[in-house]
Amino acid sequence: MNKGLLVIGIAVIGAAIYFLSNDVGQSLETSGSAPVMAAPEPTVGLIDDARIIAADDEPGNWLSFGRNYGETRFSPLTQINRETVSELGLAWFKDMGTNRALEATPIVVDGIMFFTTSWSRVYAVDARTGETLWSYDPKVPGEWARWACCDVVNRGVAVYKGRVYVGSLDGRLIALDAGTGTEIWQVDTLVDRDRPYTITGAPRVANGKVYIGNGGAEYGVRGYVTAYDAASGEQVWRFYTVPGDPNLPFESPEMEMAAKTWKGGEWWKVGGGGTVWNSIVYDPDFNQLYIGVGNGSPWTR
């Protein structure tokens, strides 16, 4: 039996079982806005588009949300089956020091597991032992919890070319060094901080860009997805999912067309909804992004 594999799982206390090990640096926490420093040549978290496309060639890793660009969430590993599942046991567990929900999908890269806990905190741990290699706390203001529909959760990170990307509950996108947890840059993704936007979804990375949406359609916001340059944090484009005030210039021909189908009432005063709170999938064959939107607002009666 290949002893490199057990299985993965993260519960409320952070239970996990898995793979290989690797040495990385210590925790460093900084703050700033993009760009804040020139990053050294990365040695950890060396994921690129080619590795994610060929994810089946390294089944012992879980390189992206959903495992691959298709987000199939299926492991091709065969060691755990009907005959062997009864032999599984707990390899290690980790108390994450919170009584709030954990909803992150761990990303596993060459023996290091990257995941988030409540309040958008990020951890890198040795996947074999559970030892914390570094952690990062974005220090989300506690009052932001009032905007979170479904607890102060976070669904995980993206790892790409030596960096770890996380969206914070209060609407920031942050890039960290995958080896040390040092902050490289952060940007404010929110178009209006007086509106109850949140981020609980995991970023997606592809083709040199980081893609992030947001939540809050229940409370009256307007949904959109933004692409940022993965290296610098500079905004590349933004796409709104619902039309805004028809008395103002439209952001795109698509929004002008969509506005013709929105009838009755002044929906733009309550945002319009349509937030992309987690469903973002990249198709490398066509270089297209597919997104799923949440409820409209005001809610239909």
Please state what every model-predicted region is:
Residues 18-29:
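Hydrophobic single-pass membrane-insertion segments
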Residues 115, 122, 127-132, 136:
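Active-site cofactor/substrate anionic-group-binding motifs, chiefly glycine-
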